[in-house]
Regions:
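Helix-to-loop junctions at the C-terminal end of transmembrane segments
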Residues: 71-84, 180-181, 288-300, 385
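Juxtamembrane intracellular "pre-TM" segments in multi-pass secondary transporters
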Residues: 2-17, 213-244, 423-426
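Helix-loop boundary and gating motifs at the non-cytosolic
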Residues: 2-70, 79, 96, 238-278
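Helix-loop junctions at membrane interfaces in 12-TM secondary transporters
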Residues: 105-127, 320-332
Length: 426
């Protein structure tokens, strides 16, 4: 037993730098994909050209959140007894790219064949759903692979790759602004979506390049413990408290799809400002990610979640209290802080809460627990914005964001340093 485990750990260390590089490259490409297909700026701007419904605008981040959430428990159970998992990662990643390809082809063919607005929206939402449902199956396998192949300095990996990806994303943000300013909508959007597609293919090459080390039987969870393990997750009181307050924090998403649209509508600025907003969003993420990675490794990722909630709440209040263009620039910087902080923390905090062998299960439970709010919040935001206006939307987001910050600060103990120690929190 000890020999097999020692050989496994040796292979992990041998492949550590190789996997670190390719995982970092994959994560860097995420910035290009996310900027070119942002559910908070680019996609709402695209869909708005075909509908006046703010509810449909709110559906964009809803499908993004729900699609990446609901399949995770299914995938975690599927992976439970499977030793070789990389092949599933590659197959699902390829499916994700089919959704991105579909949106790209739609933007290219819609003006050429004069496809109706209704059919355009149907095809768009089908492709958008395909991409993010595939992401829901992908995430547990990816996090499990990450936890095994990168056993140390994960915060540094995310920090440095997000930083470099964000810097390159600044150039992309400038390009987005240039395209939207100088070229008609129907010419600019295929280029933007094409860049996202190209980045996704580089990401796919990175995923294929990862080296899987198959664990020995001794390190696999026993089938007899499967049901008990799921029950044990819910007996982890600290983790449950985290899920409750982190779930409320999702309400910050009520505002994010509408910041760019409200700026265009209220301030009467040009469409090129969507590219500027996206650039600021990328710059904020690039600037903050190294700090998040360092702080998470040192102090724990709960601290980053708290700071992110504060940034998101301040952004919402600023948008409603000081509706000027410079203020909106600050709003998007704060939103970038929030999104990057929550993104890097939502993954890495699982390793702090979970015993090593239960990471996919903890991941799935975490995401499933956040689904009810994450599924309705952007749609609720669309209803509020349509019926009561953007201001009511932003007041609600800011107030609930602050409430979640106070709750998580009071009720959740920092799990840093206690990974795998116990399932029940004191």
């Amino acid at each position: 037993m000890h020999t097999a485990v020692a050989e496994y750990n040796q292979k992990i260390n041998t492949n550590y730098r190789w996997n670190f590089f390719w995982m970092a490259l994959d994560n860097m490409m995420f910035f290009f994909i996310f900027m070119g297909m942002s559910p908070y700026t680019i996609l709402p701007y695209y869909v708005e050209k075909f509908t006046d419904s703010k509810i449909l605008i709110g559906l964009i981040p809803t499908l993004y959140l729900v699609g990446t959430t609901l399949p995770q428990l299914v995938m975690a159970n599927f992976l439970h007894s499977r030793k070789k998992r990389k092949k599933y990662l590659v197959a699902i990643a390829a499916t994700q790219r089919m959704g991105i390809l579909g949106v790209f082809l739609l933007s290219l063919l819609q003006p050429r064949f004069n496809i109706s607005a209704t059919l355009t929206l149907v095809i768009f939402f089908l492709m958008h759903t395909l991409q993010h449902v595939a992401s829901g199956f992908y995430v547990p396998a990816w996090i499990d692979f990450l936890g095994k192949c990168i056993p140390r300095r994960r915060g540094f990996l995310f920090g440095i790759s997000n930083f470099l990806g964000g810097l390159m994303g600044l150039a992309l943000g400038w390009l987005l602004a240039f395209l939207l300013e100088r070229y008609p909508f129907q010419q600019a959007m295929p280029v933007i979506f094409g860049i996202a597609l190209g980045a996704s293919l580089i990401s796919l090459v990175s995923i294929i390049s990862w080296r899987e080390v198959v664990p020995p039987d001794e390190l696999l969870p026993r089938e007899a413990d499967r049901t008990d393990s799921l029950g044990g997750v819910f007996k982890d009181r600290n983790f449950v408290q985290y899920l409750i307050w982190r779930g409320l924090m999702v309400t910050l998403e009520i505002a994010t799809p509408f910041y760019a649209l409200s700026a265009l509508e209220i301030l009467r600025v040009s469409a090129a400002q969507v590219g500027v907003f996206t650039t600021i969003l990328a710059f904020s993420q690039a600037a903050m990610n190294p700090l998040w990675g360092w702080l998470g490794d040192k102090k724990g990722f709960l601290r980053i979640i708290q700071i992110s909630a504060l940034a998101g709440s301040l952004g919402a209040f600023l948008a409603v209290l000081v509706p000027t263009l410079p203020s909106y620039y600050a709003v998007f910087f704060l939103v970038g802080m929030m999104l990057s902080g929550l993104s890097i923390s939502s993954i890495n905090i699982i390793f702090e809460f979970s015993p090593k062998q239960l990471v996919p299960l903890y991941t799935a439970v975490s995401q499933i627990a956040l689904t009810p709010l994450s599924s309705v919040v952007p749609l609720l935001g669309g209803v509020v914005a349509e019926q009561l206006g953007y201001a009511a939307n932003y007041w609600l987001a800011g107030a609930l964001g602050l409430a979640s910050l106070l709750g998580i600060s009071a009720a959740v103990k920092n799990p840093k340093g206690h990974s795998g120690e116990e399932l029940k929190a004191a």
